[in-house]
Amino acid sequence: MPSRSDDPVAAALRQAAALIAQDIRGLAAANPMVVIDGGSGAGKTSLAELLARNWPLVGRVQVIALDSLYPGWDGLESGAERAVDGILRPHGRGLLGSWRRWDWEQNTEAESHAVDPSLGVIVEGSGILRPSTADLADVRIWVEAGEESRKARALARDGDTYRPHWERWAAQERQHLLQHHPRELATRIVTVP
C-alpha cells in the first residue's frame, strides 16, 4: 500500500499550504482573510484544513466551508453572497460577522455562528472568489484540477448523495467561471493532479 507521501494530490496540497503560509506571513494583517475557490473535488477543503493546522500567525484561525452555507443544490451563487455579506464584509470592517448553517436534510437554515473579527478567517468553497471578495480578501486562492479527477474525488467522498447532483452543480460552477473569472482574481493558483 502506498504511503501518503506517495500521494501526488496530498503532496501538491502540502506544497501549496507551505507557499500560502509564506504569503500570509508577508502580510501586515494580524487577522487576514483567505478565500479558497475551485471546482468540486479540487481539494479546497483539504487545503483549508492543512493551512489551518499550520497557520503561520499567532493565534487561531476560523475556517468556514461554503458547504455549510449553500442553500441546497441550486445555491452556489446564493451561498457565496451569504458569505460575502455575513462574513467577509463585516470582518473587513472589524465587525463581528455571522452566518447560518444550512441543514441539508431538513432543507432549511439552522443555527447561527459568529465570526470573530480579531482572528484570521479562511472561507473555502466553490464560488467564493469573485470581484466582491477580491476587494476584501488578503489572499485569494484558485485550486485547479481536471474534471475527471475532481469528479472521482467528489464522488468517492460523497458517493450516492452527490452523484445525482453532479451535473446540476457543475453547471453552476461553469456559470461562476464565466461570470466572475476567479482564476484571474487569484493571488495564487494551486494545481492539483
Predicted regions and their residues:
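ATP-dependent NMP and nucleoside kinases share a basic, alpha-helical "lid"
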Residues: E111-A156
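Conserved nucleotide-sensing/catalytic segment adjacent to the nucleotide-binding pocket
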Residues: Q62, S68-V121
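Small-molecule kinase domains that catalyze NTP-dependent phosphoryl transfer to phosphate-bearing small molecules
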Residues: T108, S112, R130, G159-P193
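P-loop (Walker A) phosphate-binding loop of NTP-binding proteins
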Residues: G39
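Conserved lysine of the Walker
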Residues: K44
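Extreme N-terminal, non-catalytic leader segments
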Residues: M1-V34
